[in-house]
Amino acid sequence: MTEVAGRPGTSGGLALRAGQFVFAAASICAMASAPGFTNYTAFCYLVASMGLQALWSLGLGCLDYYALTLRRDLQQALLMSLFVVGDCVTAILSFAAACSAAGVVVLFERDAYLCRRDPQLPCGRFEVAAAFAFLCWTFSAASALVMSWLLASL
């Protein structure tokens, strides 16, 4: 089997999953702490996408931990195919959500100047949530690339 950093069942794979989960949860918390985020579709989509990402990465993180403790090999063709599809789907959804939320934040701050006009609008929290979503996406994209590489090498 190919020795790639971040493959499932290793500490590198567990670290990738932990990073995905932590940044997805941080993005959800930052957005949920912003009053009125439900008035904007892009922010609701960000919360939904990060929720899916958090569940996916938590599940696979538990599987990685299980494989590490019992010294199991997770590099089987069927499992790898499932990991590739799941990682690619969640990476695409995370990127789309992060971009849409960041686009709305830029619109509010730089184009429409809504953040200056309405000091009650929690633009800083919106920014932080979008930034955490992009960080989550970097871990998710790295994991998707590793899984694709491993599936191609089987």
Swiss-Prot record:
Residues 39-42, 109-130 are extracellular. Pfam families: CASP_dom. Keywords: Cell membrane, Glycoprotein, Membrane, Transmembrane, Transmembrane helix. It is found in: Cell membrane. InterPro entries: CASP_dom, CASPL-5. The chain crosses the membrane at residues 18-38, 43-63, 88-108, 131-151. The keyword Transmembrane applies. One of its GO terms (cellular component) is plasma membrane. Residues 1-17, 64-87, 152-154 are cytoplasmic. Glycans are attached at N39. It is a multi-pass membrane protein. Coiled coil: none annotated. Belongs to the Casparian strip membrane proteins (CASP) family. Homodimer and heterodimers. This is CASP-like protein 5B1. It comes from Zea mays.
